[in-house]
Amino acid sequence: MFGLGLADVILERFKDFMREQPEPYKFLQVFYAQEKERFLNHKMSDYIKQNKSKEEASILARQGFVSAVGRALEKIIELLLKDFCIKNNVKMTNDKILRAKRINGELDRVKRALWVHFGEYSVLPDIILYQTNKDNIKILAILSVKNSFRERFTETPYWKLKLLQSPVTSHIKVFMITPDNDDEISFKDKPKG
């Protein structure tokens, strides 16, 4: 795995995890916990070797994990959706691809259909599912992938509100995907009533 970024290393480990779990998407939190422990132990050791205090090493290691795991989660979701897309003649792309300096005409049309501007900033959704028919592009759904619900819980409804403003985009489905690592939206017990 030499030369791979951390998100790619985590993705490769998830592929191994998939071979062990028949329904790996149900065990994302288990996988996440394993990766977090592995990463924190390794990084803390590195920071302590650099003469950082244990407390500072812990803070730095956690910050590094949060930034890396977000992109890894997007790659894992893309991997889990790959077969679905192939079976249903659906194409998938993401904001990283669409931000490249050189993209083909099809991807440029996808980008132009979804790009939202906030003053000097432009925003694209994490993952986009779409279909093509000759020169026509139909965007089916956007996926907002968040490692933590707390992270940007307002972003997903914002996308839907923006899309509803135009008859051209009002049909697009919007989904938020999160392992809910902070237990912000999970219900451990069934509600009484």
UniProtKB/Swiss-Prot annotation:
<keyword id="KW-0255">Endonuclease</keyword>
<comment type="similarity">
    <text>Belongs to the BsaWI type II restriction endonuclease family.</text>
</comment>
<dbReference type="GO" id="GO:0009307">
    <property type="term" value="P:DNA restriction-modification system"/>
</dbReference>
<dbReference type="GO" id="GO:0004519">
    <property type="term" value="F:endonuclease activity"/>
</dbReference>
<keyword id="KW-0540">Nuclease</keyword>
<keyword id="KW-0680">Restriction system</keyword>
<keyword id="KW-0378">Hydrolase</keyword>
<dbReference type="InterPro" id="IPR041551">
    <property type="entry name" value="RE_BsaWI"/>
</dbReference>
<comment type="function">
    <text>A P subtype probable restriction enzyme that recognizes the double-stranded sequence CCGG; the cleavage site is unknown.</text>
</comment>
<dbReference type="Pfam" id="PF18643">
    <property type="entry name" value="RE_BsaWI"/>
</dbReference>
<protein>
    <recommendedName>
        <fullName>Probable type II restriction enzyme HpyAORF263P</fullName>
        <ecNumber>3.1.21.4</ecNumber>
    </recommendedName>
</protein>
